[in-house]
């Protein structure tokens, strides 16, 4: 059995079912210990020609054999089958339910964690929590309760019967048990550490494989297959070594338990045989005594298995608890209200921001205003802080009080859900789900109609590409959309955002993978379809945003200029230098980009 704040609640939640299982287990254990008495009757009846039943000496006849031995044995077997089926359903059914509920808690908590958590913790490590560690918890919960009560109850009842038959023989048999208990306690601590190392090694291996499969195109392009194979072999070797180390400890424990069992059998046969020779035991009683010991062999073995499972369970529970205890850094404050009827007004007011693990401010005293319905371009060099503005607007990170307002309300005074719901977002990394194109476009809108999906695809200039596919909108994309081109992937992401028709549309460098003609079509469609709604378009190229209502030019985290393209070109030297440089690059490159 394992205990911890992440799992203790389930013992209470499933208490009625677990108590029924324990009651069934106790019943099975009790009637199981009636079998050695039947052994004694058979042996003594065969040797002496008579048996003692309930204090009466009876001749060993067919009637006595059937009535007092065979018939009781049939009932014992029937009751044991029913009881074992019942406790299996109770214990293992509860364990499955616990794993399912714990998995849901983990997923619910994971989705509320900030972006910072996922930058530190890799996908492979997280996935191992949902697979290996949860499976271990499920196994420990069901088997752990079974082994604990079975070992305790069956072991105690069998020992009581053995003690009543001969206390000296029982004391001799218990000496190896005491040694085994001490060794098991010490070894359980070692096994817990070894299991934690094993799980971490598996997580590292899983994460490495996941990254390689996701980036297989890059690996092939740079001809690094052999290098990655060598790195995988190294991690696989480390995983093998920690698995072997754990297996050695587990095997040693199993060998010690087997040695204990065999040594006790030697004691029973030696001393018990001597008692039979002296006439203090008859052959039937010795067989009965051995039958009781056989009944506690399973509890003895269960102790070994319980130590191993508990060690693994503690390690896995610690890893899962770390996830469940991970702080939710970005969360609603008490008493926040929803952002009602948003119009798309945005104001940054003297905002300075540094990422939680950052060493310097990525935004410095940023101030500018976007009126509802304006189309605004945000431009600057790579690393200037453009994406940081989006991160804060979407409340991906915590925003300093009094520095960011939506429709005149401090974003910290309104719910995160309502702020994000007022926005449609196309990130730099255009993520697509491994699902149909229709599902990907309609992801942001519940029950989106096919007509709406088709219209959004047309606005993103991707409809013609989609209908050319064999299955059209029902084409299933590969993982992360790898079955479509970069430009198609980008335009499907734009269609998904346009379908939401949110008051605020944010496109973060979202037309970089399309040609100039397609870019112009998309921008023209945005202008007509987004009339009266706020649009933020982050871009590296000035030509992408020069026709927008105004442009915010950012340099080294500071807003250097805000205004229409022509005004910035006249008044801002750095902006003018960037425009001229990009024009020169276009002329040298034939005027194309993407």
Task: Name each model feature, range by range.
Residues 1-35, 47-72, 86-91, 95, ...:
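Membrane-integrated ABC transporters
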Residues 106, 110, 219, 320, ...:
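Helix-loop junctions and hydrophobic alpha-helical segments within the transmembrane domains
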Residues 339-594:
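ABC-type nucleotide-binding domain
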């Amino acid at each position: 059995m394992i205990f911890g704040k992440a799992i203790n609640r389930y013992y209470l939640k499933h208490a009625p079912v677990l108590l029924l299982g324990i009651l069934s287990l106790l019943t099975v254990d009790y009637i199981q210990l009636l079998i050695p008495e039947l052994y004694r009757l058979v042996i003594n009846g065969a040797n002496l020609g008579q048996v003692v039943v309930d204090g009466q000496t009876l001749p060993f006849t067919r009637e006595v054999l059937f009535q007092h031995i065979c018939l009781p044995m049939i009932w014992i077997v029937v009751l044991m089958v029913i009881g074992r089926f019942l406790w299996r359903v109770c214990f293992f059914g509860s364990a499955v339910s616990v794993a399912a509920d714990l998995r849901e808690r983990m997923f619910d908590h994971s989705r509320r964690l900030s972006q910072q958590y996922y930058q530190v913790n890799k996908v492979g490590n997280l996935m191992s929590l949902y697979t290996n560690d949860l499976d271990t918890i499920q196994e420990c919960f069901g088997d752990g309760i079974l082994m604990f009560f079975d070992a305790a109850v069956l072991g105690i009842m069998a020992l009581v019967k053995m003690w009543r038959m001969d206390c000296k023989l029982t004391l001799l048999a218990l000496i190896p048990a005491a040694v085994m208990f001490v060794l098991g306690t010490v070894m359980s601590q070692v096994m817990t550490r070894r299991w934690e190392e094993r799980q971490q090694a598996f997580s590292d291996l899983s994460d490495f494989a996941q990254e390689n499969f996701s980036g297989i195109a890059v690996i092939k392009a740079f001809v690094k297959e052999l290098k990655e194979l060598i790195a995988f072999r190294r991690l696989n070797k480390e995983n093998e070594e920690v698995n072997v180390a754990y297996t050695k400890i587990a095997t040693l424990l199993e060998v010690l338990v087997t040695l204990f069992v065999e040594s006790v059998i030697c004691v029973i046969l030696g001393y018990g045989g001597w008692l039979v020779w002296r006439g203090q035991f008859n052959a039937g009683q010795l067989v009965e005594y051995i039958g009781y010991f056989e009944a506690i062999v399973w509890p003895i073995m269960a102790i070994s298995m319980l130590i191993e499972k508990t060690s693994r369970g503690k390690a896995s529970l610690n890893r899962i608890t770390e996830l469940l205890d991970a702080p939710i850094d970005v969360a609603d404050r008490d008493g926040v209200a929803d952002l009602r009827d948003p119009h798309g007004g945005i104001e940054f007011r003297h905002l300075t921001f540094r990422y939680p693990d950052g060493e310097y401010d990525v935004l410095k005293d940023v101030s500018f205003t976007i009126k509802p319905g304006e189309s605004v371009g945000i431009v600057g060099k790579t690393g200037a802080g453009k994406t940081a503005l989006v991160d804060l607007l979407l409340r991906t990170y915590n925003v300093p009080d009094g520095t960011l307002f939506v429709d005149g309300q401090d974003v910290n005074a309104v719910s995160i859900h309502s702020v994000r719901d007022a926005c449609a977002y196309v990130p730099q990394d255009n993520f697509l789900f491994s699902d149909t194109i229709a599902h990907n476009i309609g992801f942001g809108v519940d029950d989106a109609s096919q007509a709406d999906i088709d219209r959004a695809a047309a606005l993103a200039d991707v409809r013609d590409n989609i209908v050319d596919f064999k299955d059209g909108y029902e084409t299933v994309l590969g993982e992360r959309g790898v079955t479509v081109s970069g430009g198609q992937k980008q335009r499907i992401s734009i269609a998904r955002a346009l379908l939401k028709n949110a008051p605020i549309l944010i496109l973060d460098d979202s037309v970089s993978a399309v040609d100039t003609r397609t870019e112009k079509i998309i921008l023209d469609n945005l202008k007509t379809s987004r009339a009266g709604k706020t649009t933020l378009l982050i871009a590296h190229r000035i030509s992408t945003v020069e026709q927008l209502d105004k442009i915010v030019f950012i340099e080294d985290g500071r807003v250097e200029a805000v205004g229409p393209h022509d005004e910035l070109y006249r008044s801002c030297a750095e902006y003018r230098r960037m425009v001229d440089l990009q024009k020169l690059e276009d002329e040298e490159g034939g005027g194309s980009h993407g």
